[in-house]
Amino acid sequence: MGASPHIGIAPATGVGGLVVIITAGAGGAGRVIAETFADAGARVLTCDLDGRAVAQFVAERQDIAVLEGDVGEERTVQRVFDEAERRFGPVDVLVNNVGIAGPTAAVEDISTEDWNQSLRANLTSHFLCARRAVPTMKARRSGLIVNISSGSAKVGLPLRLPYVVTKGAILSLTTNLARELGPHGIRVNAILPGAIRGERIQRVIASKAAALGVTAADYERDLLRYVSLRTMVEPEDIAAMIVFLASSSGQRITGQLIGVDGNIEYEA
């Protein structure tokens, strides 16, 4: 598909000096989120399981702290937060960006291992990071947690059950935490992206097309027929929304499930 049209967005303000942790932030949309915050003056630490992406990010952006690790593990979560606090101070913003595509398969063909792997990456990691972030945020009566879900959490996506279920659970995690933590001054929101342009969505499209017995180009064209703007989402679109939520303009926004998806009418 051709490049999507862009609407001009003013540079983010009001996030300078904030301490931000972004999980799965060495590549793809996560890296764009990290760079957008850093370019706006925030102090950013990100982590990623992909050692090669981590090494490349470290080489290219010395102003962003980057660690290698799996935040599906409690000890890694502790290490990530300890390092952010040591370098920069208390964490103001947590962006739970970790997520895997999971298997493309009929429900009867999904292994327990694949199911549990999706739960661990897409949901447990969010819980572990939020749990670690909350005590300090409570003590300061301030903080923002942003969970990355998916537009498919609302409309379903055949042959992608573990992905859709875990992304749907993130919506419940978000709304419940927003109610629980709001009295402590902590805001919690979810972003529901559409198909984010990049290598990952191309792999997903290829896998789904193969499962359906169609070409990748035909499946992508059919997918975008159900998006009102007829385009994929750019990583910069996701980053801009999250930085807005962290800015002074977003200080009264919590408990919201925000679609950044071109308006998904129905996801094939």
What annotation goes with each model-predicted range?
Residues 135, 179-183, 251:
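Alpha-helical segment proximal to the catalytic Tyr-Lys
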